[in-house]
């Protein structure tokens, strides 16, 4: 038998006060704790390791629910133990009062006539008997193997005997504890559910604002400088999301100002060079015929072309260009333009299609792609038209990796073996004109099926995807291939196939 006791000094004459000098109360055997005296908490692990992507609202809800559950469990244990200890203290006080009354009756009448009181009970716990032998009145709580709690109270008599009183923890007290536990469980569940709902509500609001901020930032990145992230997220409450939005807006404004300043400087320099270069070319044409004159004319023409290209890039960067739309038959248009430009280039019209586009800008894109293939690739150069898709392929070393990863960039040729063979403006202009047309310009390298990336490319393909509908604005730049999307049409399937084969080559 195990338990705990509370001792009291015995009284000699009736009515003598007694003191309570025993050890402090024990929490009792009814405390429901796990191993080591702590409740066991099971966690969920491996979400990041498994690559599971969850929304902010669910993370916040789970965190609030977990904290609420832990707090509810801790408070429930504290309340349960406090209630049990309080009820045991009341039961011990009652047993102590009853044994004191039984002692007085026995000493007054000389016989034991109090219910449930016994003299020299052989079942008296040894721990309680030792306290009684010390001349003190005491109470003791023990627990049977079957979980039933017993309450003992004993007092030494003047004649040397020991009077004890034994009672069980009443069913009524057990029912009260059971009802209390049930109320605590219901309250804990309500706290967890309420916390989860609150987490979903708060997290959903925050997640929505973050999604709107991300969408607005993507619009700014795609070429819409007038979009403001702070205006996009809205809301009356000011929090960290507003700080992020203001920081993104400030960064976008600073970048836009720098880009605009760079564009203006480039345009001003090119414009200032245009007049003297034209004069130089005119003067070179007046020189007497001969090899030196041809060299001067060739370099003067190259300089004029460079100046014109720089001016065109500056205009395209200003996002002020507008397409002059016409309805054309794409296959026939490409065939006639390529034949006039370079009859040696093979043109195949797989599927004819009528498109609404700007013929001048489309011709500019097509000629720049052909010039790039002729300059940096190897023959034969092939052009194919399939619906709204134009492909230009050569059999050279392929595009450089940085071009495939980042897109065309001015004054970057992308390969050391082509030093001095270009300024990196051809594909930059082609990409800018494609943007004005609302088209998409993509690049990829051709390798044998299943060949690793280090195997040299067997050719390069530039693909122009004309839009199904006529462009209504020029605020977005052409995108590189999106490997996560594929369509049902043959052109969409081809785009997915091209994007999966990797990218590499020239500017």
From Swiss-Prot:
GO cellular component labels:
plasma membrane
Membrane topology per the entry is:
Multi-pass membrane protein
SUPFAM superfamilies per record: ATPase domain of HSP90 chaperone/DNA topoisomerase II/histidine kinase, Homodimeric domain of signal transducing histidine kinase
Here the segments flagged for biased composition (Gly residues) are 25-37
Tagged with keyword Transcription: no
Disulfides per UniProt: none
One GO MF term? ATP binding
> What keywords appear on the UniProt entry?
ATP-binding, Cell membrane, Kinase, Membrane, Nucleotide-binding, Phosphoprotein, Transferase, Transmembrane, Transmembrane helix, Two-component regulatory system
Domain named HAMP is located at 204-260
Q: Which domain of life is it from?
A: Bacteria
Q: Which reaction does it catalyse?
A: ATP + protein L-histidine = ADP + protein N-phospho-L-histidine
Q: What Gene3D superfamilies is this protein classified in?
A: 1.10.287.130, 6.10.340.10, Histidine kinase-like ATPase, C-terminal domain (3.30.565.10)
Annotated coiled-coil segments of the chain: none
Q: Does the keyword section mention Lyase?
A: no
Q: Which stretches are transmembrane?
A: 60-80, 183-203
Residues in Histidine kinase domain copies: 268-470
Query: Which PROSITE patterns did the record assign?
Result: HAMP, HIS_KIN
- Pfam family example for this protein? HAMP
Give residue spans, biased composition: Polar residues. Answer: 486-507
- Residues of the region (Disordered) are 1-42, 472-507
Q: Where in the cell is it found?
A: Cell membrane
Residue positions, PTM Phosphohistidine? 271
The Enzyme Commission number assigned here is: 2.7.13.3
What PANTHER family does this protein map onto? SENSOR PROTEIN CREC
Name the job this protein performs. Answer: Member of the two-component regulatory system CseB/CseC involved in the stability of the cell envelope, through activation of transcription of RNA polymerase sigma-E factor. CseC functions as a membrane-associated protein kinase that phosphorylates CseB in response to changes in the cell envelope.
According to UniProt, the name of this protein is: Sensor protein CseC
Species of provenance: Streptomyces coelicolor (strain ATCC BAA-471 / A3(2) / M145)
């Amino acid at each position: 038998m195990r338990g705990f006791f509370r001792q009291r000094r015995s009284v000699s004459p009736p009515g003598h006060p007694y003191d309570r000098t025993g050890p402090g109360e024990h929490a009792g055997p009814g405390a429901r704790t796990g191993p080591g005296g702590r409740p066991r908490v099971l966690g969920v692990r491996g979400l990041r390791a498994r690559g599971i992507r969850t929304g902010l609202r669910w993370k916040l809800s789970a965190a609030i629910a977990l904290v609420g559950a832990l707090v509810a469990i801790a408070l429930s244990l504290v309340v349960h133990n406090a209630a049990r200890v309080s009820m045991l203290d009341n039961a011990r006080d009652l047993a102590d009062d009853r044994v004191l009354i039984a002692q007085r009756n026995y000493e007054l009448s000389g016989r034991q006539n109090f219910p449930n009181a016994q003299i020299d009970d052989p079942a008296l716990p040894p721990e309680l008997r030792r306290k009684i032998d010390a001349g003190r009145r005491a109470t003791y709580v023990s627990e049977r193997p079957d979980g039933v709690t017993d309450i003992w109270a004993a007092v030494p008599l003047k004649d040397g005997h020991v009077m004890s009183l034994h009672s069980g923890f009443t069913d009524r007290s057990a029912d009260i504890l059971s009802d209390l536990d049930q109320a605590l469980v219901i309250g804990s569940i309500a706290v967890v559910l309420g916390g989860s709902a609150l987490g979903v509500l708060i997290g959903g609001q925050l997640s929505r604002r973050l999604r709107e901020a991300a969408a607005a930032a993507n619009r700014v990145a795609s070429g819409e400088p007038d979009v403001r992230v702070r205006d996009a997220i809205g809301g009356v409450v000011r929090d960290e999301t507003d700080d992020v939005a203001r920081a993104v807006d400030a960064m976008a404004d600073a970048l836009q100002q720098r880009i605009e300043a760079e564009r203006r400087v480039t345009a001003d320099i090119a414009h200032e060079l245009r007049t003297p270069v034209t004069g130089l070319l005119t003067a070179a044409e007046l020189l007497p015929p001969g090899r030196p004159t041809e060299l001067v004319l060739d370099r003067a023409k190259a300089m004029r072309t460079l100046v014109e290209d720089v001016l065109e890039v500056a205009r395209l960067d200003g996002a002020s260009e507008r397409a002059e739309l016409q309805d054309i038959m794409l296959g026939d248009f490409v065939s006639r333009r390529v034949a006039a430009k370079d009859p040696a280039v093979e043109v195949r019209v797989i599927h004819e299609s009528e498109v609404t586009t700007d013929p001048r800008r489309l011709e500019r894109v097509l000629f720049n792609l052909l010039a790039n293939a002729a300059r940096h690739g190897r023959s034969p150069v092939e052009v194919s038209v399939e619906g709204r898709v134009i492909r230009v392929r050569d059999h050279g070393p392929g595009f450089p990796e940085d071009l495939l990863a980042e897109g065309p960039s001015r004054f970057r040729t992308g390969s050391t073996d082509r030093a001095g063979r270009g300024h990196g403006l051809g594909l930059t202009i082609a990409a800018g004109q494609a943007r004005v047309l609302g088209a998409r310009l993509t690049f990829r390298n051709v390798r044998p099926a299943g060949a690793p990336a280090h195997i040299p490319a067997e050719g390069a393909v530039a693909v122009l995807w004309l839009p199904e509908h006529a462009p209504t604005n020029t605020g977005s730049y052409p995108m590189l291939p999106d490997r996560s999307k594929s369509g049902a049409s043959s052109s969409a399937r081809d785009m997915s196939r091209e994007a999966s084969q990797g990218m590499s080559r020239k500017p």
